């Protein structure tokens, strides 16, 4: 079960009758503060995501509900770092390219976060489907994601889980960074062992060796995302064994993007490889500098 957290946005609403019995985890129509979960969209070990609505205005939203295990992870991070959990951190981030957090709290013994609803899907899925939503505007989508990350860093936050799965599109096609569940402030970059987070294929080498998080590790993960966007495949083969996957990052050279897809321009390849330099001091010193170079390329460079 979740620990205590201050509730936000609790309205005078009642729990309703069963709705999600076929989905397993929740056996009643779940009310979270002033919002109601309507349709299960996705789920994993840490959380379940629902399409929801405001009980009075019917505004469509996304409701993220942490599982018991997700609550344990959130409590562990809060206790180890002495910092607010995801809802409180994310609610302070206000930028056109960062998902808006509308409310957060605890209900039914679980933490929840209410966010703006992004119906456009995530970038990873859109790329796999060759969706018209991103075809012809892949670079612009990543530029927008970079603007969001630039802002996040300016607010003293390190995302720690940058990947195409965590870039989603709004109805008008605007790209937004999502999922600040493992984000951390710059003041807490010296972490105790055992708190390494993120997807192995997107982890910078120094993170695997030394558990060091900073803006540069986000830049590396952004570079991996650019590589995937440009070539249609990850820079390294993946492994279901997490230790083997981490070893690949340290020991397997990155094939130059143009060796995978010769149509990629040399200038775009240069941007990708600089963002993914094994040594952090050889990477872009900031997302701002990376964004400056991205302004000089288009989808014609793919």
Question: How should each PLM-predicted stretch be described?
Answer:
Residues 70-92:
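AlphaC helix of the eukaryotic protein kinase fold
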Residues 108-122, 126:
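Conserved short submotifs of the Hanks-type protein kinase catalytic core
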Residues 147-157:
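Protein kinase catalytic-loop region centered on the HRD/HxD motif
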Residues 104:
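Activation-segment/catalytic-loop signature of the eukaryotic protein kinase fold
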Residues 141-142:
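Activation segment signature within eukaryotic-like protein kinase domains
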Residues 193-206:
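Conserved activation segment of eukaryotic-like protein kinases, specifically the C-terminal portion
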């Amino acid at each position: 079960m979740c620990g205590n957290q201050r509730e936000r946005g609790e309205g005078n609403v009642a729990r309703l009758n069963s709705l999600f019995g076929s989905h397993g985890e929740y056996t009643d129509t779940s009310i979270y503060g002033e919002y109601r979960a309507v349709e299960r969209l996705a789920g994993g070990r840490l959380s379940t995501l629902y399409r929801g609505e405001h009980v009075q205005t019917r505004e469509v939203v996304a409701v993220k509900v942490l599982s018991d295990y997700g609550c344990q992870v959130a409590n562990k991070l809060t206790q180890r770092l002495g910092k607010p959990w995801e809802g409180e951190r994310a609610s302070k981030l206000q930028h056109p390219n960062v998902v808006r957090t509308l409310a957060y709290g605890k209900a039914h013994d679980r933490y929840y976060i209410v966010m703006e609803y992004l119906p456009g899907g995530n970038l990873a899925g859109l790329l796999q489907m060759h969706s018209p939503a991103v075809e012809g505007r892949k670079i612009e989508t990543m530029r927008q994601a970079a603007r969001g990350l630039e802002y996040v860093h300016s607010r003293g936050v390190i995302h720690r889980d940058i990947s195409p799965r965590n870039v989603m599109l709004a109805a008008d096609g605007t790209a937004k960074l999502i999922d600040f569940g493992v984000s951390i402030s710059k003041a807490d970059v010296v972490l105790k062992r055992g708190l390494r987070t993120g997807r192995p294929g997107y982890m910078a080498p120094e993170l695997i060796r030394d558990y060091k998080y900073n803006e540069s590790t986000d830049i590396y993960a952004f570079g991996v995302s650019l590589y995937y966007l440009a070539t249609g495949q990850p820079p390294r083969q993946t492994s279901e064994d997490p230790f083997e996957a981490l070893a690949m990052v340290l020991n397997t050279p990155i094939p130059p993007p143009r060796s995978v897809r010769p149509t990629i321009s040399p200038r775009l390849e240069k941007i990708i490889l600089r963002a993914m330099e094994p040594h952090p001091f050889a990477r872009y010193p900031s997302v701002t500098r990376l964004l400056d170079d991205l302004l000089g390329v288009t989808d014609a460079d793919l």
